[in-house]
Amino acid sequence: MTLAHIAKRTLNVSVTMFHALSPAVPREATERIERHAKNAGWQLELINANEMQDPNYLENPVNRCFFCKSNLYSRIAQFTSQPILSGTNLDDLSDFRPGLEAAKDFEVRHPFVEANIGKRDIRLIAEDLGLDDIKQLPAAPCLSSRIETGLHVTNEKLMLIDSVERLLKEEFGLGIIRCRVKRVGIVIELEETLLNKVDCNLRQKVDNLVRIYGHNKGVEYSSYKQGSAFLREKL
């Protein structure tokens, strides 16, 4: 989102911002985008990337992100012949990112990478631009990333994940919160400061919520571990 603000303020050409509507995108993320677009005067296009109709994506393989981004960039290309810019930053290159291969296929440019800008610098830029509500937002990968590799992506799983994470965000506010759907069941991962605040009352609320979605096993709680639903070595 910071890139969108920079583009709007500095480029002397028409710029259109694209945001994907999807069960894998939390509702609050879409609401945040719409709020910023209205306040900043962006030209915003809300699009359906149709990844939920792609069986390759739904099978949740190790390179699921490739199919997600391929669908997204293909859809954006239907709206414009202009260059597509992504908010990918320098730190993203140190991780396994199959979506970057899709970006190559569509000749997507990554201005932050080209300028050697990482996450810390982006937060400083956001602060300098007065973007107080996003400068400290924790990383928020799509909800499908919470589903263990090889388990199919479904609307029901995504709704469960979104509902649980919204409940926990209402309880804790900002912080790293992940609801993982794994073969062993539901695992809630929290940063240590939040994990220490989980009490019996909150556990009961979460248990009641996941039962609505047909999960009757107990919910596990553990410290946050980046990418713990990703099983690259098994597939």
Predicted region positions:
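Mid-to-C-terminal catalytic subdomains of enzymes
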Residues: 113-117, 123-178, 221-223
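Alpha-helix N-cap and loop-to-helix initiation/capping positions
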Residues: 60, 64, 153-156, 197-202
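A short, flexible beta-alpha/helix-coil linker loop
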Residues: 52-53, 148-150, 193-195
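Small/polar glycine-rich anion-binding or flexible loop at a beta-alpha turn
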Residues: 175, 180-188, 223-227
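Short amphipathic alpha-helices in soluble, non-transmembrane regions
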Residues: 164, 199-210
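A short interface-forming secondary-structure element
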Residues: 183, 187-201
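Soluble or luminal CAZymes and related metallo-dependent hydrolases
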Residues: 68, 72, 156, 160, ...
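ATP-dependent adenylation/nucleotidyltransferase module used to activate substrates
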Residues: 1-128, 186, 205-216, 225-227, ...
